[in-house]
Design a protein with these regions (language model features):
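Hydrophobic residues at beta-strand termini and immediately following loops
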Residues: 27, 63, 106
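Catalytic cysteine-centered active loop of the rhodanese-like fold, especially the PTP/DSP P-loop
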Residues: 67-113
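A short alpha/beta connector and helix-capping loop motif
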Residues: 58-65
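Flexible, polar/low-complexity N-terminal or interdomain linker segments that lie immediately upstream
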Residues: 1-42, 46-53
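Residues at secondary-structure transition points
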Residues: 27, 56-58, 86, 90
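A generic structural signal for secondary-structure junctions
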Residues: 37, 56-57, 111
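Short loop/helix-cap segments at secondary-structure boundaries that form the rim of catalytic
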Residues: 52-58, 70-74
């Protein structure tokens, strides 16, 4: 019986982690390709510097997760990417807590690009 409870808790935990953040728009990598040259958006890659150097998109500024996002302009849309979508989701949460209104997460990250 306790094994089933543990399994249920693990499933609920991972389901919760995968849920989109309230107030954060999610786009696919195909949608990203259509907006990459939009000068009204700020593109942020939250992977490590090494990951970014190995395979980064030139439109994205590398600001690793855990860095200070408060210097980004709050009047522009912030589009966030990472390797798989998990770190970018965390960064989107941080941006929302800092008062950013227009935040977009790229689903699947660079792995899907």
């Amino acid at each position: 019986m306790s094994t089933w409870i543990i399994i249920a808790v693990v499933v609920v935990f991972f389901a919760w982690r995968m849920m989109p953040t309230k107030g954060v728009k999610t786009i696919s990598t195909d949608e990203l390709k259509n907006i990459l040259n939009d000068k009204d958006k700020i593109f942020v890659d939250v992977r490590t510097q090494g990951e970014y150097k190995a395979r980064g998109l030139k439109q994205f500024k590398n600001i690793p997760l855990g860095s200070d996002f408060s210097k980004l302009p709050k009047d522009k849309e912030i589009v966030v990417i990472c390797q798989s979508g998990m770190r970018s989701k965390q960064a989107c949460n941080q941006l929302k807590k800092l008062g950013f209104e227009n935040v977009t997460n790229v689903r699947g990250g660079m792995s899907a690009y």
